[in-house]
């Protein structure tokens, strides 16, 4: 048994999370006793159909329960430190179709809670708690019509959501183990795609190889819709068609590269991994040049990562590496400082360096500022210093997207910084992105992603070595 498996053999630390949330509320002015109230996602039916929609648990509820059941509820009484889970009672009509549901006794063994009751006990329990305490925290829009909080003198429907969002930014050992597990499975799936690349003829075959491996290894859900982008489609950041042939019809040869941004989700926790590789098994000279720049962008960014580092500084470092590399190739002209000041590198690296990762792919607590007038930082999803315990993606890229770059070429001020003749050789490269998931520690960082990454490793894997 690995250390990850050993950690995950225990219960999800729901009560510790409840205590952390209360501590945050107290640090932000709440005093006295109170109750936290949360609801799971409801079972919903597909419109005009008798089948259920795919289920995705509410993350706020899961953080304080570890429970993936639909239609459940929870209460946490602050002064008694009592966490109660409410699960749906047995419905005889559904047993013939779905089997027996989890019993309260089974749920008590499975989850880190003090008591398990049926959902028919929600309102009586809330009324009893209201007779003892005056304050209940809930989330606006996540309170069922048949649930009454009116007996509480005071109700706050804002602070709890904020508190959980902020607490989620720092992961405990169990959460990191969940993300590591998702990464282990995801890395295996990336390897499966590398091995299938030479014989595949369409993007969808590689998507199938990825998803099939994830399911077989324990990640039944994808963290997000896979991006399987061949050829110049790799210049589109969130390409999702995944249905194009891998052969270029104009040359009858395989397209240069494939960008695979795909990851599994393990029990509500996500990975987020990107690799770019040559479909032929060998990078073209231009592709290899860009790949090496992007890998260096990531390498220098990773070297900076530790508790307290300013994420904006890491992002700027990645841009500096991109500028140096593109200057060396002759794509850019001018001085490094002038190119940085004019934000010319944003034409080739238009997105943020990364984002927090956890129960959501773009996890909470990043404090993005999409209204920032500085286009270098406008799409940076994390602002400020990185705390120990956070998990963040590091995903630099260089893209040759005509829609983004051509306005620079037409701009009388900015066009002088880009050599259009040299650039012409690189349009076919499309885009290169490399993405790993990094756990920030007090001493530095830990890379949770193990998928092959260097150009030589990738080529060897595709060619069966």
Curated annotation (Swiss-Prot):
**Which molecular-function annotations from GO does this UniProt entry contain?**
manganese ion binding; metalloaminopeptidase activity
| Gene3D superfamilies recorded | Creatinase/methionine aminopeptidase superfamily, Creatinase/prolidase N-terminal domain
UniProt: Mn(2+) 2 binding residues: 261, 272, 435
Q: How is the cofactor bound?
A: Binds 2 manganese ions per subunit.
The cofactor required is: Mn(2+)
EC number, UniProt record = 3.4.11.9
| Domain of life according to the entry | Eukaryota
**Which key words tag this protein in UniProt?**
Aminopeptidase, Hydrolase, Manganese, Metal-binding, Metalloprotease, Protease
The Gene Ontology biological process annotation of the record reads: proteolysis
Catalytic activity field: Release of any N-terminal amino acid, including proline, that is linked to proline, even from a dipeptide or tripeptide
User: Which residues bind Mn(2+) 1 per the record?
Assistant: 272, 395, 435
Q: What role is this protein assigned?
A: Catalyzes the removal of a penultimate prolyl residue from the N-termini of peptides.
What family is it from?
Belongs to the peptidase M24B family.
The molecule here is called Probable Xaa-Pro aminopeptidase pepP
């Amino acid at each position: 048994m690995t250390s990850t498996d050993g950690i995950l053999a225990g219960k999800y630390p729901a009560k510790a999370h409840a205590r952390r949330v209360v501590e945050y509320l107290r640090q932000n002015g709440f005093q006295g006793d109170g109750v936290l109230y949360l609801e799971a996602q409801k079972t919903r039916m597909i419109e005009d159909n008798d089948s259920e929609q795919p289920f995705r648990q509410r993350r706020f509820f899961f953080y304080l329960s570890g429970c993936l059941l639909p239609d459940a509820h929870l209460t946490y009484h602050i002064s008694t430190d009592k966490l109660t889970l409410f699960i749906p009672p047995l419905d005889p009509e559904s047993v013939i179709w779905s089997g027996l549901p989890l019993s309260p006794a089974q749920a008590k063994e499975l989850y880190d809670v003090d008591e398990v009751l049926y959902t028919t006990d929600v309102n009586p329990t809330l009324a009893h708690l209201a007779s003892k305490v005056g304050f209940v925290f809930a989330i606006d829009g996540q309170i069922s019509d048949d649930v009454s909080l009116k007996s509480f003198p005071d109700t706050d429907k804002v602070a709890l959501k904020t508190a959980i969002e902020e607490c989620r930014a720092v992961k405990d050992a169990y959460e990191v183990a969940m993300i590591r597990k998702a990464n282990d499975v995801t890395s295996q799936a990336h390897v499966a795609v590398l091995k299938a690349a030479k014989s595949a003829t369409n993007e969808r075959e590689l998507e199938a190889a990825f998803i099939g491996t994830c399911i077989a290894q324990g990640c039944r859900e994808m963290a997000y819709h896979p991006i399987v982008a061949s050829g110049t489609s790799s210049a589109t950041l969130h390409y999702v068609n995944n249905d194009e042939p891998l052969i270029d019809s104009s040359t009858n040869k395989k397209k240069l590269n494939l960008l695979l941004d795909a990851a599994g989700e393990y029990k509500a926790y996500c990975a987020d991994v990107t690799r770019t590789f040559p479909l032929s098994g060998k990078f073209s000279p231009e592709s290899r040049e860009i790949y090496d720049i992007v890998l260096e962008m990531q390498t220098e960014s990773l070297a900076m990562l530790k508790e307290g580092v300013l994420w904006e500084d890491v992002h700027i470092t990645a841009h500096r590496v991109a500028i140096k590399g593109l200057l060396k190739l002759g794509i850019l002209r001018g001085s490094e400082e002038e190119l940085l000041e004019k934000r010319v590198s944003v034409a080739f690296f238009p997105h943020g360096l990364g984002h927090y990762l956890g129960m959501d792919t773009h996890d909470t607590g990043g404090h993005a500022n999409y209204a920032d007038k500085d286009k270098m930082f406008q799409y940076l999803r994390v602002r400020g210093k990185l705390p120990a315990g956070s998990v963040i993606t590091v995903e630099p890229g260089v893209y040759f997207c005509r829609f983004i770059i051509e306005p620079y070429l037409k701009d009388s001020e900015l066009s002088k910084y880009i050599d259009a003749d040299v650039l012409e050789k690189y349009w076919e490269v499309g885009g290169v992105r490399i993405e790993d998931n990094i756990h920030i520690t007090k001493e530095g960082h830990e890379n949770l992603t193990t998928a092959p990454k260097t150009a030589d490793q990738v080529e060897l894997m595709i060619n069966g070595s």
